[in-house]
């Protein structure tokens, strides 16, 4: 090796010659014929978007329905309990109506029952339970159950002339219909 090769290193490395690549011109699609793959991709994208929008709408509807169900569950949670208390309320009212007499013991019993009834009504009102006492009102089949019909007499036809049993509503939902007698035309 020569001194020059040692100091400068080996001679310049041979550079590869640039290759000439013959490029074929890209064939353009004839005018008026869209690319089939592009059309398929657009169609798939459209279908996916449609599915996405439908899924979003379905989720929104489900969310609304669940919110409504939860609200109703809170609102009407007392329904079974209230239905069980209605006969107790009826019995208390009948007991008060039957407690006639001037004896001091009867008067005390009546007074206690009236106070209890007042407390019952207060609690019912507090929890959204309303009484349906339709005497003299127009017959409403959504809130009243006709037990009999009587000749109208002085009452207008199709009005309630007698109430056998009061009805009750829980937050405007019927707990029990009022049992009534309706004036006949």
Curated annotation (Swiss-Prot):
CDD domains: GrpE (cd00446)
PROSITE patterns in alphabetical order: GRPE (PS01071)
One MF annotation (Gene Ontology) recorded for this entry: protein homodimerization activity
Compartment(s) where it occurs, according to its Swiss-Prot or TrEMBL record: Cytoplasm
Keyword terms: Chaperone, Cytoplasm, Stress response
Stretch list, region Disordered: 1-44
Gene3D superfamilies associated with the record: 3.90.20.20, Head domain of nucleotide exchange factor GrpE
GO BP terms in the entry: protein folding
InterPro entries, A to Z: GrpE, GrpE_coiled_coil, GrpE_head
Chaperone in keyword set: yes
One of the record's GO cellular component terms: cytosol
Highest taxon in the source lineage: Bacteria
Keyword DNA damage: no
Major subcellular location class: cytoplasm
Assembly and oligomerization: Homodimer.
UniProt record similarity statement: Belongs to the GrpE family.
Alphabetized HAMAP family for the sequence: GrpE (MF_01151)
Function: Participates actively in the response to hyperosmotic and heat shock by preventing the aggregation of stress-denatured proteins, in association with DnaK and GrpE. It is the nucleotide exchange factor for DnaK and may function as a thermosensor. Unfolded proteins bind initially to DnaJ; upon interaction with the DnaJ-bound protein, DnaK hydrolyzes its bound ATP, resulting in the formation of a stable complex. GrpE releases ADP from DnaK; ATP binding to DnaK triggers the release of the substrate protein, thus completing the reaction cycle.
Protein name listed in UniProt: Protein GrpE
Originating organism: Methylococcus capsulatus (strain ATCC 33009 / NCIMB 11132 / Bath)
Gene designation per UniProt: grpE
